[in-house]
Amino acid sequence: ALQPQSGYKWKTLYREDVRTVAVPIFTTKSFHQGVEFQLTKAIVTQIEAMSPYKVVDRDRADTILEGEIVDVRTRTVSRDRDSAVPQEQIQGIVVNFVWKDLRTGKILQQKYNFEESKVFYPTLAESQFTGTQSSVENLAVSIVHEMQADW
């Protein structure tokens, strides 16, 4: 027979051996300047909101999350049949990142060509900036999800 106490474990989704993380500004290979600042700010905001980790300076941090924006791209999904004006576009951001324990040198998480994208509608007065900002926010949430402990 199953014992009730042998079922689920109630514990945090995040590593319990980490309390602090440094998040330097992501570097970029993209010509879309400024996205690295938006992304870094969004990651810091999401770490503080979603996880038990505190973002601190590198000299006080248990871990460091570093990354590089590899590409920022816009794809047109649909155009107006008569004018060829884009009606629906996708803004995508591709990053490489590594989360490392500064105390041991151990890599806690590493991802290459990690991408998040968001649809936006220029014909509804949504600009490329709107698409980029939405992609940045989605990407920040996804990166913080990757900082959860392995099951």
Predicted features by range, described:
Residues 1-60, 70, 74, 103, ...:
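A structural "domain/chain start" motif
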Residues 9, 49-54, 59-108, 117-132, ...:
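Surface-exposed short loop/turn segments
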